[in-house]
Amino acid sequence: MARNWLALDLRSLGLLRICIALCLLVDIFFRSFHLVAHYTSQGFLPLRNYISLPHITERHWSLFFLGDSPFLVTVLFLIYATFAIGLMLGIRPRLCGWMCWAFLLSLYHRNPNIANSGDSYLLAILFWGNFLPWSRFFACRGKSDKAEPEETYHQSMAGAFLIFQVMFLYRSYPKGTVLFLLLFWLGIL
């Protein structure tokens, strides 16, 4: 039986879930070094100043709009890290995935000055991943759900959009510009 080229292997989705969660944990770790400077009232963009710009914040929401005290921001970061660990281990991955998406979007909206395209890409992967069955392999499950799935491939629109997202990101690979940019970034050229 021929497989459709848009079908995703469920084992690779499980590994994708783990890798995305590890990326989130590394991101949380590095953001925590500058937590006070970037996300609190003692930093360069206090919440009251940011909210006073309605042309920027009128359509945005953020969990970090609840307050900007260092204690509250630290608690929110710890909750975010807890959901990322849950996503990595596969403990209620759908809930953890959506909560990680909400927290990352909240960070993005709280201080857009430090956001980059990697944040947008991670948001998109989390969004599409939450519609995929990425908990079928390599996930902590209850005793009643220990049997391995019979089918190891999954085909859906969310999977197709995930594949297209990766394809569009790496569309410059055949042009040869990716290698040039990498060598330039490494200082070889």
Model-derived regions: residue spans:
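Alpha-helical membrane-anchoring segments
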Residues: 1-189
